[in-house]
Amino acid sequence: MQVHVVDHPLAAARLTTLRDERTDNAGFRAALRELTLLLIYEATRDAPCEPVPIRTPLAETVGSRLTKPPLLVPVLRAGLGMVDEAHAALPEAHVGFVGVARDEQTHQPVPYLDSLPDDLTDVPVMVLDPMVATGGSMTHTLGLLISRGAADITVLCVVAAPEGIAALQKAAPNVRLFTAAIDEGLNEVAYIVPGLGDAGDRQFGPR
């Protein structure tokens, strides 16, 4: 599996805001949107493009556009905070949704929503989730995508734990992962340390 850490001063600054416990809900959402855009830039750096003949006010020239805009798949609910900025950068993209909650006793994923196209053959997919902790929610999501024929899958997250990366490597070794940081690991209740806290609660308030 390809793992890319986005090492950029602007990404580090937004990540600092997200980590800071003093950041309120609105500030957290704003920093997440801005960091999502930086992740999108890096993840699409080598995206296939096609030439587009156009005319400027002065002359004819040739521009470019993405050959195949991706399907964006936010993992609810925390991934909701990433989808608007990703969609703004990729306006031709379609959007699917996967909903996965976490059982606080077992730390296992509890799926509750699957809104994806039936056939994803030859469709590039970008999965959006601020955190890859145990990897349970993400491996569930990847399984849904792969079962529908998806083969070109990129995961975008803010922070990832080594345990989660190992789980993804085992479940879907051909996936690409772009993250702003790989943290130390998981604590006794399977939260990433130092992490961000609960990314859903920090965006929208506690459930």
Curated annotation (Swiss-Prot):
Cofactor annotation remark: Binds 1 Mg(2+) ion per subunit. The magnesium is bound as Mg-PRPP.
EC number of this enzyme: 2.4.2.9
Activity regulation field: Allosterically activated by GTP.
Molecular function in Gene Ontology: GTP binding; magnesium ion binding; uracil phosphoribosyltransferase activity
Protein residues bound to 5-phospho-alpha-D-ribose 1-diphosphate: 77, 102, 129-137, 198
Cofactor dependency: Mg(2+)
NCBIfam families: PRK00129.1 (NF001097), upp (TIGR01091)
Family assignment from sequence similarity: Belongs to the UPRTase family.
Name of the protein: Uracil phosphoribosyltransferase
Source organism per UniProt: Mycobacterium tuberculosis (strain ATCC 25618 / H37Rv)
Gene: upp
